[in-house]
Structures are given as structure tokens and as C-alpha cells.
Amino acid sequence: MAKQIKYGEEARKALERGVNAVANTVKVTLGPRGRNVVLDKKYGTPTVTNDGVTIAREIELEDPFENQGAQLLKEAATKTNDVAGDGTTTATLLAQVMVLEGLKNLAAGANPMLLRRGMAKAVEAAVEGLRRISKPIDNKESIAHVAAISAADEEIGQLIAEAMEKVGKDGVITVEESKTIGTTLEVVEGMQFDRGYISPYMVTDAEKMEAVLEEPVILITDKKLSSVQDLLPLLEQIVQHGKKLLIIADDVEGEALATLVVNKLRGTFSCVAVKAPGFGDRRKEMLQDIAILTGGQVISEELGYDLKDVTLDMLGRARQVKVTKEHTTIVGGAGNPEDIKKRINQIKAQIEETTSDYDREKLQERLAKLAGGVAVIQVGAATETELKEKKHRIEDALAATKAAVEEGIVPGGGVALLNVIEDVQKVVDSLEGDFKTGAKIVLKALEAPVRQIAENAGVDGSIIVEKIKAAKDPNFGYDAYREEFTDMIKRGIIDPTKVTRTALQNAASIASMILTTEAIVVDVPEKEKSNIPGAGMDMM
């Protein structure tokens, strides 16, 4: 396919136009007085949102050269969202300011490679400064604060704080759409996986259609159970000791299933069988997780165990097991806390090493199930549009809160970036030439968020920036919602350090890329072929 190419100044100008198209659309949403943006949907009602990354993702430009600039800026927003879950608008704004400042300097003859290195040094100093002023988050009240600010709703803040308190910081918190108007929190203690009973005859509560086993023993195997002969020695021990049994196997069918059901109906012993969760290698890992959690062993021929030789001390134990048509929940597994801790650390190490987002998500689910349980926030609203918007806000707030627990918090409203200006100024003073110019680009960008928040609230940004700088108080800032200066930490206007740090690093990374671009190559658009048939008759 033929290509079109633009070089040098012309290429960078096209990128600049693309950057401006995205940034000017996104930055109007920054701060508590930020405006909304309406996104057209081909089907259904338009989406009204003030979430930076949602808006950025929708933007595609007609000009292919300008579109490259737009896509690069979207990368800064998306990457920030993936890592920190928030801060997308800040990242977009910072990147725009750095690109515009950098291009001015390039036009004046600066060397792009030296600018890039100067910017990197300045960002390094700013990140160190952020870590220095960061305050750790450790109590429920401050967690609720962070969540309430991100979601702009105190009730949601409380729900998220409660969820984190119940399942721990490594626990999984999922957000689902509710059938009702209210928003509620449901916490599933222990380990839950998406497999229900194999036969409905196994239920203990016919009204709720669920099976509840108190103090059961748990057989965990990767085998398919079809012959009753394999199970008989174990079942005899179960009856002898009057135990209740949960079987987690690859499958239970035929004569083995019939025997279990008949004995359950006769009241000989209580038993529930479920299929093992997951597939392939992931299934083996999950069975091992369940074994460690319950203090049992995986009965597998790979490990040299035969079902006929299984004794009660090889089975797992739990305080309670609840099985519905779709889920199995194991509460109060009797595993050794040391072994569980080792397994948790092993999964954490795998999360660090993996490069696949899907694998990371699945590993985090496994980690949560071992580390404390699952909390589900059921989101309700009066209309479909409101429901989508509310769910979005809660997901954002959840990610921001997790980031705050991880790396602590800094004063919000863009004040943290103003606070690290002194750290960056020291770097600027120590550099010369184009290195210095590069560091100054970052220095100027650090003022942009406060300026934009003020301007979105209808106030002169420059005056606000100067007043905050003059105060010499690290927590002093402008509350755009109440339109007054205040102590940001006391007022509860805070940002997770991770969000601010990630936004700055990603913005500088994308800006450096654009500034060091010397050519853009895009496809030549295909001319649409005319479908009108030729007039007249063919020659015979």
C-alpha cells in the first residue's frame, strides 16, 4: 500500500494539532467544577461523562497525520488509567503543555535529544519530591475520604472504605449493575469460585436451592469420577466418622454420581459434588490454592496419589461450605497460615513478572481469594444513563483508593505538583544549555493543573498559582468547589501519590516521543471506487 510522509517541522505541527484536539476536549473536565462532555453513540442514548480516558478513547481524527498525535496522547491517558486508575485528565493536560513548550523551543533551534534528557532529569526530581511529601493511608476514615473525592459522593466513599476494610487491600472488589435503585455492598467471605453443584438433588435447603455443609471434609482431585469403586474406601471412612463431604473434581458422573445422590437422599451421609474451577494449567493452580487454604492435598496421579488410598487426613477442612447453582464458597479454611502466606507471596511474585494483562487479572483474583475474600458493590440508579455514569465513577474511585493505599496521598487540586517546583528548580539551576531548557519545560507544566482547575471554575488561573506559591505552606491550596483558599489535607482534598506520579511520568514520556519525532508515515487513503455500471451495450 502506498504511503504519505511528512518531515520535520511539518510533521510535528500535525502532531501538535492532534494533541490539541484531544487535550482541549479532555481538560475542560478537570476539577470539581469541570464540565461534562457528551459522547455520541451509534446506538442508544449519548453518554455524558467527565472521565478523561473515556472521552480520549472516543476521539479519532479524519486527518491521518493529526490522528497520530491524538493517538499518542491517548496512550498517556490510557497508560495512566491502567496503572493508577485515575489521573487521565491530568496526564493529558501535562503532556499538552510539555509538547507545546517543547515545540516552541525546537522552532527556536533547540536540540530535541538534549531537551528530552533535561526533561527526564526534571521528572526524576519531581517524583522524588512527591515521594518525600507523600503521607501514608492506613485508617478507614482516610480511605473513605480518598474514595469520596474521586467519586464526588460521600456514600460511595463509605462503601469503598467498608469493602476494603472487610476484604483487605489485596482483596478483590468488583462493581456490578444492580436491579434496584440503591447502591449496596455485599461481602463474600472466604474463597468463592464459579462452579455450582453437579446435581440439584444435593441441596440441603430446597427453598433457597442451596447446599450448606457445616465442618465438612473436602476431597480435591483433578480426576474425572465415574466408577464408584474408586470412591468406596473413602465413603466408608466418611460414614464411619459421621463427616459431611464436599468433592471438587474434574467431573462426577455415571455410577459415582448416582451413588452419592442415593446416599444423600437416604440420609446415609451429606455430600455435595462440584466441578473444579478454571481450565488447563490454571485449574491445577486453583486446586492447589484450595488445598493450601483448606489444609488438604490435591489427589492427582501426577503427584503419585490414588483415590483408593485416600485417608481422611489427606482431605481439606473448612468451617462452612455453601454451594448454589452457580457458586461454591468455602468459609474458614483450616489451612496452615504459614503455607497460605507463602502461597500469597508466590502469586504476588508472579503478578510482578507477568506481562499479560489477562494473566495479571486472573492472578489478582486468585490472590484475593486466598488473602481475604471478595466484595461486590451493586450499583443502582433510576435510568440507564445514570447507572453507566455512576458505575464509571465507582470504578474510578476504587482504582484511585487502591493507589492511595499503595503509595500514600499528597495534597490534591494540583498543589502537590506546585510543591515539587523547588525540587525541579534545583535541577534546572544545575543544568546548562538545552538540558536546562528541557528541565524548564517540566517546570512550566507543573503549574498547569492548578491553573486549569481554577479556569474551569471561572477564576483567573495565574492569580491562583501565584497566591499558592506565595503562601509557602505545602498544604495550602485552592478549593475550586467552595471557591476559597484552604488547607487541602484538612479539607480532605487529596490525591493518591501513585496517580500524580504516574500522570507526570507518562505525560513526559509521550511529550518526549513527540518532540523527538522527525517524520510521520501514514497510508494514502484509498479512493472510493465508483459502483455505477457503464452505459450502453457490450460489443458482440
From Swiss-Prot:
It catalyses: ATP + H2O + a folded polypeptide = ADP + phosphate + an unfolded polypeptide. PROSITE patterns: CHAPERONINS_CPN60 (PS00296). It holds the Pfam family Cpn60_TCP1. Belongs to the chaperonin (HSP60) family. Forms a cylinder of 14 subunits composed of two heptameric rings stacked back-to-back. Interacts with the co-chaperonin GroES. Together with its co-chaperonin GroES, plays an essential role in assisting protein folding. The GroEL-GroES system forms a nano-cage that allows encapsulation of the non-native substrate proteins and provides a physical environment optimized to promote and accelerate protein folding. This is Chaperonin GroEL. The gene is groEL.
